[in-house]
């Protein structure tokens, strides 16, 4: 009889209660900020980390989970009698974590040549609850008797149409990290310019620029409507960093889409380290990209 584990990392942003409910195994990233090493989901809450970023002098950096750490986790599954592990790490193009997992498979063969653990390593091509939610869906389907091959196909099919729109209310973090120039950030702040950014297939793109904080939410919702027009089984989620604009985004989405979000969730340390601590995100079903 199959015994299946679902393994991911803290970039998934799955709330702890959901992870426990569905039995999702989450490995934590380390985040270095002003010479202090934080273990995501362990050292502090998301809200505390947002505050630390706002007060920091430097830029947070994340360390990839190592092959040794993955090999130890795989060995644990072998010892506990698992037959399969579905491993979905952070987007391959944004971290060496995926390749480290590949290396760990080779290490496992050397350390446990007799093992029969099947490792299904998947690249979600995205971040946060864009894939985290569907890992929970996967876990529920497996519990109800679905085949591994079926849930993997369904997961990959879903990832092929998921998109994110980001609305950062401050350019400070993007300036610090070099994602925009210091001059552009200063001018943007002085003029109240806010970029509207999509994150699709692991790639970011500035889709629009609006002037004034009050224009951010309408622009995000309008862009989502345009990109999801005609999509069957449309759903959406809202990510946030505990800022007042979260409620504005949810209200606007409920009005525009005629339905509540699947989930309103906090952006974790890995994601907010890149977006900044004053950001809202709209995750939604777009058209298949093939």
How does the language model describe each region?
Residues 3, 11-25, 30, 36, ...:
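Mixed-charge interfacial surface used for oligomerization/domain docking
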Residues 69-101, 105-108:
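N-terminal glycine-rich phosphate/adenylate-binding segment common to multiple enzyme folds
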